[in-house]
Amino acid sequence: MNIQLLQVFLTTAREGSISKAALTLNYAQSNVTNKIQQLENDLQTKLFYRHSRGITLTPPGQILVSYSEKILHTIEEARAAMGESSAPSGPLRIGSMETTAAVWLPQLLAHYNNLYPNVDLNLVTGPTEQQIQAVLHYELNGAFISGPIEHPDLVQEKVLDEEMVLVTSASHPVISSIQDVQTQTMLVFRKGCSYRAKLNHILQEEGLLPIKLMEFGILEAIIGCVSAGLGISLLPRSIIASHEKEGRIRSHTISDKYSFVSTMFIRRKDTLITPALSAFLTHMRDHFQIKRPDQS
């Protein structure tokens, strides 16, 4: 099976469009179409449905996506192993929730980057579910997510615990009970965010659903709109502490049974521990004072 054909197929499947895949690969659209047809002929099956809105994967195509990811990842690992030296170098892609990246990672990443300048370190931010899928599909070497989670293909290490608080404008009255938010507009991240899932769990437990939600893409927008009195939000205390100190917003504690969430670092069990990743894991454990998984 031709590796280039698999790369073209997987890119097309991820982009969901031949034209977008062509742009990503810097190919002509006709070249992408021809390579997909060649792969379909080799496998004697249709991999995509063609329709007026574009393309979608057939059942055999969905199966091939998983195999293609594994094959291409194994080839990348083999190349890395062949060129490997004891000094950390090469690409390292780490994912993180936006809030974790903003508060907890700057010093860690800066120190790591100074120690290992030959590592091509790349940080990708996004909600927890997006990070999990990226790790599972070999797009990231590891990621900081909200957890814990259970998945047979993942290894996880607890990094820290975060206290969650309700956040309002500075002039907002004290919130003494979660019931007080029933008439408020809740400002949340897009679906897939663990803090939004946490809020939904709390509201469901307290019998407060449905409630009005307003969705935002970035943290700064939520904090700005909370400060202006547009609504309230549920966020880690660490991320809003400086804004509260400036008098822009006000935090309100919630019940202990809801108030803490754990940040975990996940990676695939079968991922190759390159010198770059090994050094990152060691540096991360030292930074957050984490015991190795094999230590008691």
Curated annotation (Swiss-Prot):
Domain HTH lysR-type, residue spans: 1-58
Disruption phenotype: No effect observed.
Keyword tags: Activator, Amino-acid biosynthesis, DNA-binding, Glutamate biosynthesis, Repressor, Transcription, Transcription regulation
Family matches, as SUPFAM superfamilies: Periplasmic binding protein-like II, Winged helix' DNA-binding domain
CDD domains: PBP2_YofA_SoxR_like
Superkingdom, taxonomy of origin: Bacteria
Annotation: DNA-binding region: 18-37
A Gene Ontology biological process term: regulation of DNA-templated transcription
GO terms of molecular function: DNA-binding transcription factor activity; transcription cis-regulatory region binding
Keyword Transcription: yes
Cited Pfam families: HTH_1 (PF00126), LysR_substrate (PF03466)
Keyword Transcription listed: yes
Similarity comment: family membership: Belongs to the LysR transcriptional regulatory family.
Physiological role: Positive regulator of glutamate biosynthesis (gltAB genes). Negatively regulates its own expression.
Protein name: HTH-type transcriptional regulator GltR
